[in-house]
Amino acid sequence: AYFDAASARAEGAVQLHEGKPGNLERAVEQTFGDVDGGFAAADLVREHAFHYAEVNHAMMEPNAAVAHWDAERGRLTLHSVTQVPYYVHLALARCLQLDESAIRVVKPFVGGGFGHRTETLNFEVIAGLLARAAGGTVRLELSREETFLTHRGRPETDVRMKIGLTKTGAITAIEAEVVQRGGAYAGYGLVTILY
């Protein structure tokens, strides 16, 4: 088992998944403008590395869902605290093996999410499965402990940044490498690297 990104990416590390050499879930490279020229024009160039621990979100309202199965029409309606109702909709269709038109996801006002709810969460799918099995309505609410145990949180992140500045404080160039530890089964949280 690897407990940090550096170990998982080290030479000779066991490849965890077929088609993912170097144990990289995804690599994104972006270049804008003349970075080398920007550093050459800088009066000051600073380079530093930062480490950010994994974060578990603590929203005020709990993770909860109400699922209703309409047996007569073969339709599911799910009310959930999600930030991404369309992703939940697609995941429910796939997991319940239903046509997408047979599923409706309702997202009420979400008081807090902080990125925690930017992927389909297990309790949403479980609520849908239970409602169908019961042939009616199921309400599922996770305790704080259950939420911490079943969610990946925001991944541990290492950032190496180099920045060029003029004497007036204008930024002339930035070079950054950001690595997030997503684990063997990365979730949507890895997309936060792009924000």
Question: Residue spans of the language-model regions?
Answer:
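Structural alpha/beta core scaffold segments of enzyme domains
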Residues: A1-Y195
